Structures are given as C-alpha cells and as structure tokens.
Amino acid sequence: MIKVLIVDDEPLARENLRVFLQEQSDIEIVGECSNAVEGIGAVHKLRPDVLFLDIQMPRISGLEMVGMLDPEHRPYIVFLTAFDEYAIKAFEEHAFDYLLKPIDEARLEKTLARLRQERSKQDVSLLPENQQALKFIPCTGHSRIYLLQMKDVAFVSSRMSGVYVTSHEGKEGFTELTLRTLESRTPLLRCHRQYLVNLAHLQEIRLEDNGQAELILRNGLTVPVSRRYLKSLKEAIGL
C-alpha cells in the first residue's frame, strides 16, 4: 500500500483529491491537514510515502514546509496549486511532481503510475536535501500557532514530550521540527545532545571542573554544554 497524506487549506480541494484516491486499491490515505504546522507533525508521526501538498497556504507555504521536514523521513512531494508560476520553484524544492488545480484525473493517474514505478526502485531517504535556511520556527502554545523569528530564539531543547523553543523573553513553545532539522537549517549551534543555542544571545560561558560548561544567556537563562560539544562551541566564538 502507498500511504498518502494530504495537506491543503481548502476543504473542497482535499475532498476532491480524497474521493479520487480512495478509488485506488493500493492507496491508503493516512491523514489530512489544513495547514503546514499540522502537516509537519503528521509527516513525522504518520510517515507517509507520498505528500500531496498545496503551495499557497496561510502563514507557512507548502514550499516553506518542505524545507522544515526532516530529510531522513521526507516523503515524495506532489505539489498542488492553482497557479503554474510556481512550477519551476516547486521542482527546485525537489518535488516529485506538480499538479494544477482543479486536478485533472488523467494527469493524476500519470502521477500515481510514476509513483508506483519509483517506489519499487528508490528509497525515499535518498532524495536530495533542501539546504535553504529557515527564517522562523513554527510553534504552538496556549491554543495558538505562531512563527518565532530566528533572531528571537534563545535556545531549543528536546525532552520526552517533544521539542521546545524558548524565546529571548523566556516564553516557550512546542515545535514539530526535530533538533536535526533545526541544526541543519538554522544558525543554532549544538551545545548538548538535547540543546541548540543561539550564540547571538550568549553572555557568558561558565566552565566546570568536569570538562562541561554552562551558558549564561542575556535573559538570565542557562543552557548546559556537554564535554563533547565544548570544543566546537569555543571555536564558534573564536576561542
């Protein structure tokens, strides 16, 4: 079975695509999302083989969402849009295919045929990475979704319950992005197995006798530094 996830902010567009895909005996629709933040979480949780992704969505576009996905678990991307002006950009973002709305069933059939053929010979994890840097981190908290600009991020931490972003004001939000994705797509520096830090907010490094250290940020918060990452941290600040 080919596991499919649909991410589109238009309910009617999702329904039309769903109805057609449900007629395919080898297609399983594992989920539907109405925005990119939900979509990122669904990709990480459901691990679809194929992502049908609308390009034009509020706050975070489909093109931006692709750059936020963990490259090791990125599905085949089929972009959906009503405007063909995005075609070249879509394929720069490593799209498998590109469909114009309203979707033509014959054209979609060709896409599915190519997907079936491709899945039989290629591991999706070998698809090239999108190296474009992230300008913000999508976060959720207190029944809202917000975009935290990189300059306002103090540090990011990974816990049993997920990945959390702390702002320079000390406010905390949950993100669906992984530490691996954030490390490769942002200026944040790894200082610990469970922490990334924004050196722009660093005020002091407090060295400890056991070879570890603690970072004191400008907002007074502290971030641990493990022995493994202390050398690279010093090099990053010119020591």
UniProtKB/Swiss-Prot annotation:
Any one of the GO BP annotations: regulation of DNA-templated transcription
GO cellular component: cytosol; protein-DNA complex
Effect of residue 54 to N: 10-fold decrease in btsT induction
One function term, GO molecular function aspect: transcription cis-regulatory region binding
HTH LytTR-type domain ranges (all copies): 137-239
Sequence ranges assigned to domain Response regulatory in this UniProt record: 3-116
PROSITE patterns per UniProt: HTH_LYTTR (PS50930), RESPONSE_REGULATORY (PS50110)
Keyword annotations: DNA-binding, Phosphoprotein, Transcription, Transcription regulation, Two-component regulatory system
Disruption phenotype: Deletion of btsSR has no obvious phenotypic effect under the conditions tested.
Modified residues (4-aspartylphosphate): 54
Highest taxon of source: Bacteria
Description of post-translational modifications: Phosphorylated by BtsS.
PANTHER family linked: STAGE 0 SPORULATION PROTEIN A HOMOLOG, TRANSCRIPTIONAL REGULATOR-RELATED
NCBIfam families named among the record's database cross-references: PRK11697.1
Function: Member of the two-component regulatory system BtsS/BtsR, which is part of a nutrient-sensing regulatory network composed of BtsS/BtsR, the low-affinity pyruvate signaling system YpdA/YpdB and their respective target proteins, BtsT and YhjX. Responds to depletion of nutrients, specifically serine, and the concomitant presence of extracellular pyruvate. BtsR regulates expression of btsT by binding to its promoter region. Activation of the BtsS/BtsR signaling cascade also suppresses YpdA/YpdB-mediated yhjX induction.
Name by which UniProt lists this protein: Transcriptional regulatory protein BtsR
Organism: Escherichia coli (strain K12)
